[in-house]
Amino acid sequence: MWTGSNSKDLKVLNRLLVRDMIRRLGPIARYEIAKETGLTPSTVTVIVAELLEAGVIKEVGHGASSGGRRPILLELNPTAAYVFAIRIQRGELMTAIFDLDKNIMAQRYSHLDTDLPDNVVEMIGSSFEELIEETRMNPDAILWCGVACPGLVSSHRGVVERSSNLGWIKVPLSALISKRLGGLPVHVENISNAAALAEKEYGLGRGHKHLVFINLSVGIGAGILADGEIYGGVKGFAGEIGHMTLLTENGPLCACGRRGCFEAVCGVRAVVERAKATIPAETFAEYGISKDELTLADLAFSPLANCTEAQRLIGEVGRFIGILVANVVNLLNPETIILGGELSNLGDRLLQAVKAEVEARTLEEIQKTVSIQISNIKGSAPLMGAYALALERIFSLEEWDGQRVQANWEYQISG
């Protein structure tokens, strides 16, 4: 149970405790809150009355009787506040407004030039305004913005220190987005870390304290949860497994400037380019697919995926990714590995190739305790993670009543 250094601190902590209990366990009765928290029934009654008056929670009928009157049940009011969530990826932007119960009120998906941060920030602002207009929502009801972005992210400073795939160096992204959105608080996290958090909260990672989400996209990265918390290393940059070396001689050039990285061999762009180079022109013609316009989706979902060359390529990519996963398993000894990102759409063919390599390359004692699965989160795991990060921050606030948080912003445009 939380404690405070004085009565004011204790009152605030008790309020946070009750609010979080209702959020996580609702519908729940007042007496159950008192039992779970150790607070007196009178304290719970006062706090609940305050939360009801603020519109943060609501009464939702009656529970079962244990002999007396049936207790009134409480749950979080999902429309008490909203979150603006963003996923940035090379050439793509995904934005959405969520309520407090992870329902998407409206969303946008855009293709754009992501080389210039100002272009991305402006598109974020335009998307925000379009979503507000579509939902007819008061923008002040949106309390926080969460952003999932590829690269080395100093989340405590809101700065993208380096993103090889975006071509960004030292971009104060939190401050730039906050300014464009009229002062809305913004939290930026690495895209793989965000996805790992989404898996912990909403996906296959529920109930697991030690998991690794491997994002198989344009870039390749890992979000690592150790004892239930994101593990970032000394500066928060842990998980850049796409820049581990696969080929030491004459490897392809990576966006980071080095040769032979896993990402340069197994990233989405690399796989598509290898498919263009290895699948014969007559095969493209046979399946009615333009070689120049080939996408990963063609290799995952179209009949082209069944041609001999595509099958061989997918098997090889699966083996390489399996080597990468085996290294992660031997190094971190996680409970579960979750594969996500566009390459995971290759499905069971990819998964079986990965599992075969892990079985061949990991120590038996470590191997037998790990599960390897493809993410089952509908939509975008990084977007859901951006939402979860923002939600965490909303529920750490001492007070809120559905109006814009007046935060003391530490992020500055100067970085």
Predicted regions and their residues:
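Glycine-rich phosphate-binding loop and adjoining helix at the ATP-binding site
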Residues: I104-H210, R349-A360
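Active-site glycine-centered loops adjacent to acidic/histidine catalytic or metal-binding residues
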Residues: I191, S217, A386
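Short glycine-aspartate micro-motif
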Residues: V83-R87, I142-G146, L211-N215, G221-G223
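Glycine-rich phosphate-binding loop of actin/hexokinase-like ATP-binding domains
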Residues: L204-V265, G415
